[in-house]
């Protein structure tokens, strides 16, 4: 029983390390993925497409996702390229 509990703890720790990224989904243009005119479930669906566990439309402007893999590109103010072309 002790080994099983230890196994579960290790499993959850690995899951937290592997998929711990959260942030705004970014489109191909470098901008946040807009959700202003989308249905309520749009962001949750978009987040699950990139293997995130959940997401919502933050202030009705942009999709924010939780627990995404590290390979997913997210919008960051420091590296913002939105509106500057490719």
Swiss-Prot record:
Disulfide bonds: 31-82, 35-57, 43-63, 47-65
Keyword hit for Iron-sulfur: no
CDD domains registered for this protein in UniProt: neurotoxins_LC_scorpion (cd23106)
UniProt keyword annotations, A-Z: Amidation, Disulfide bond, Ion channel impairing toxin, Neurotoxin, Secreted, Signal, Toxin, Voltage-gated sodium channel impairing toxin
Example GO BP: defense response
GO molecular function: sodium channel inhibitor activity; toxin activity
Domain LCN-type CS-alpha/beta as annotated: residue spans: 21-83
Classification via PROSITE patterns: LCN_CSAB
Tissue distribution of the protein: Expressed by the venom gland.
Signal peptide: 1-20
Entry remark concerning the domains of this protein: Has the structural arrangement of an alpha-helix connected to antiparallel beta-sheets by disulfide bonds (CS-alpha/beta).
The protein, known as: Toxin Td2
Organism: Tityus discrepans (Venezuelan scorpion)
Organism lineage string: Eukaryota, Metazoa, Ecdysozoa, Arthropoda, Chelicerata
